[in-house]
Every structure is written in C-alpha cells, then in structure tokens.
C-alpha cells in the first residue's frame, strides 16, 4: 500500500513532523490559518523551528503522490491520504479545565474525508481515554464509518522541544500505539521509518496517553520543589543555585532549577491528568500543589524585585523597569501561556512602569494575546530596575550597566548573568 500522510495542524509540533515525513512520503500539511499556509508555501516558518532552506527542500507545488510537503487549508487536498496525524494544541480554559475544542474540530475535519482502511493518529497531549472516548466518536459520527472495522486509530505523543535545535524531532525516541495489535505495529513502523532515535510500542493507546501526560507532570512537580526551595533559601539568605550545584555532585540528584513555568505543555498538561483523576473520585494532592506553587512564582518574583528596590531607596510608584523577555522560554518566539505576564501585571499593581524588550517575540502577537506593548529594539533609556525574565542568547552580551541607573536593581530570574545581580531565584 502506498502511504500518503496528512498532518493536521502546522504549529510547533506539526510542521517539524510534516517536514520529516516529507523526506520519505507524500505529505499534505493542513492548517485552517490561511496566512500560515501562505507563509509556509513561501518557505517562511514564523515559529523558527524549520529554517528556510530546509523547508524549501521538501516543499512541492501540489498535492500528488510524489514525496514532499504541500501545505494547504483546503480540505479536498487531504481526501486522498490514508494516514491522518492530528497535532493541534490542547489548552486549558480560564478555570484550568481541559479545552478539547481544537481536537473536536480537527476530528470533524478528518471525519469528512475518512475512508475505509484509513488510520488516524493523534499526537496532542491529553488525559488517558481522550482518543478513544472523545475523538473516535466524532470520527464515527461525521464519517459514518465504524471504528476498528472500517478505520483505525493510533496515538503517538509529541515530544517536541520548541527552540531546541539539538533535540529535533527525529532525534527524540517516539512512543507509539494502535487501536489493535496489528495497527500498533503499522503505526510503529511508520514512525520508525523516519525517527532515527527509535520507537517504543506501548501496549495500548491509553498507556501511551498516560505516559505523555506524566512526563510533563513529573517535570512540573520537580520544578515546583526547587521553586519552594528557592523561597525557603531566600528567607535563610542562602544562594539557591549554590545549594543545587553542591547537591548535584551526588550521582542521583535530579538537576532542576527554579523558574517560571509557562508554555503550552508543562504548565498545562498536569491539569489534564488532574481532571481525569477527579472524574474518578480521586483528588490529586501533589499534582495540584505543584501547579499552585508554580503559578504563584510570577507574583513572588515581582515582590522580591520591589523589596530590593525599597532597600535601595527607590520610589516604587512611577519607577521605570525594563523586563528582558516575554516568551515562555529562551531562544523561541512562542508567547503562549508565558508567566512573564504574571510578573508584569504584579509589578504594574505596585505602580511600576514596565518596558518589555524581547528580540524574539512578535509585538502584534503579544498585543493580541495579552494587551501588552513590547519592543524588538533595545531601549536607550536608563531604568530603576532590570529583570532578566528569559535567557535569550542576545541578553548575555548586553552591557546592562548602561541601561541601569547607578543605584538601580538587577534581578536575574534565570540565574544566567555573569555580572553580580542584586537578586535571583
């Protein structure tokens, strides 16, 4: 059987995967954002995950049976595919409840073109049971086909690390699964054909779903632990980073650093597992405690900065502060669920005027998402305080002394500045 793949959703997860598959198979990348499609077909990836030459190296001008990637927002272009890989976001709502709307919508799209023998693979991070209990019924309803008789499903959780040019998609081992043992093997072989790091075939879709959601929950809890340590050691006037460095000399000490936990994965996925646990009558203690602690860190950083400013005799109301970075992580333009926003809002509550400088973030995106003004140009003014919130590579070469007033405060959230900061986590 000739394999033809449709990748639904061309964001940070879908595009690198579609590009990789396109080196071996005919691939149609589908996204409802027409501007995104136009950019990609011109060889421009706004997420900066794929460079122009690499992207143009796989692009083709039409949906055919030739190897390569064709990007489209027209549903007819995916109707001849036999593998559908769904890579849409799985966010939470304002009450931190899972929002499966993107999954439902993409399942409806696939259902409209689903044929006998097709396989639908989900990569979006979900709680155990979503694929078979939430997505499959949508596929059956829209297509009129019967699951595991007419069409089949798989689940292979994404492990993309945005901004990481070392651990790219083909270099990260892939967990795979299928709705039957035979389909599991077929899904596994498909990924194995392009993932050089290898694959791990899980015994069921639910096992694969659970594996992914605990990867991120474990990381969230570990960061919450060191964030709590940072609060304690700050009260004891001990350098947290020095403590972690000393403790890290033991071979089995886990290397985590304190910080703001944002983005579309670590700060979101634990809520998916918590929701499923609560549905079954169990209240997760550690998972939600970790979330509460990590969500409190933005306000904590702001309060620490203000205390340092007061100690230096700086008038808080009307003070000028430079925030370095707004994205959720370094060397990446992604501003989804960034916790720098919590710091900015908390500082503004004190009456501090915050200027946000980030060479990676799109000002229009930040304005749309958070109603905040950012600049890609380094300001020429001097400030009462500077907060390094994101460890972009550009920030390590800036002479911050020229931007800071003589008695100004420098706070290093990430612990990366060579010069002596007045405070850090």
Stretches with model-predicted labels:
Residues 1-425:
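Structural/interface elements that position substrates and couple domains in central-metabolism enzymes
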């Amino acid at each position: 059987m000739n394999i033809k793949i449709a990748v639904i959703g061309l964001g940070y997860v879908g595009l690198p995967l579609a590009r990789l598959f396109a080196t071996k198979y005919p691939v149609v990348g589908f996204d409802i954002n027409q501007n995104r499609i136009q950019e990609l077909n011109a060889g421009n990836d706004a997420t900066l995950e794929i460079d122009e030459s690499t992207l143009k190296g796989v692009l083709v001008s039409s949906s055919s049976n030739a190897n390569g990637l064709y990007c489209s927002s027209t549903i007819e272009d995916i109707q001849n595919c036999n593998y559908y890989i769904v890579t849409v976001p799985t966010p939470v709502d304002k009450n931190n409840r899972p929002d499966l709307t993107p999954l439902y919508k993409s399942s409806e799209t696939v259902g409209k073109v689903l044929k006998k023998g097709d396989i639908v693979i989900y990569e979006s991070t979900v709680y155990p049971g979503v694929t078979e209990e939430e997505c499959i019924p949508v596929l059956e309803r829209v297509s009129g086909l019967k699951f595991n008789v007419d069409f089949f499903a798989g689940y292979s959780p994404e492990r993309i690390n945005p901004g990481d040019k070392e651990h790219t998609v083909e270099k990260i081992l892939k967990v795979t699964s299928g709705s039957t043992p035979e389909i599991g093997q077929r899904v596994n072989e498909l990924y194995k054909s392009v993932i050089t790091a290898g694959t791990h075939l899980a015994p069921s879709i639910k096992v694969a779903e659970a594996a992914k959601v605990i990867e991120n929950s474990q990381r969230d809890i570990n960061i919450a632990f060191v964030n709590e340590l940072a609060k304690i050691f700050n009260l004891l006037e001990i350098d947290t980073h020095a403590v972690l460095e000393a403790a890290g000399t033991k071979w089995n000490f886990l290397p985590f650093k304190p910080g703001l936990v944002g983005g579309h994965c670590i700060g979101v996925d634990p809520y998916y597992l918590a929701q499923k646990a609560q549905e079954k009558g169990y209240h997760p203690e550690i998972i939600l405690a970790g979330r509460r602690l990590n969500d409190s860190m933005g306000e904590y950083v702001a309060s620490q900065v203000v205390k340092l400013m007061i100690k230096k005799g700086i008038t808080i109301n009307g003070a000028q502060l430079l925030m370095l970075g707004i994205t959720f992580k370094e060397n990446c333009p992604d501003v989804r669920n960034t916790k720098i926003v919590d710091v900015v809002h908390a500082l503004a509550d004190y009456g501090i005027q915050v200027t946000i400088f980030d060479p990676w973030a799109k000002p229009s995106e930040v304005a749309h998402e958070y109603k905040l003004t950012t600049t890609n140009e380094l300001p020429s003014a001097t400030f009462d305080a500077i907060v390094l919130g994101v460890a972009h590579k550009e920030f390590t070469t800036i002479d911050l002394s020229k931007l800071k007033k003589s008695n100004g405060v420098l706070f290093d959230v990430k612990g990366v500045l060579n010069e002596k900061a007045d405070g850090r986590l």
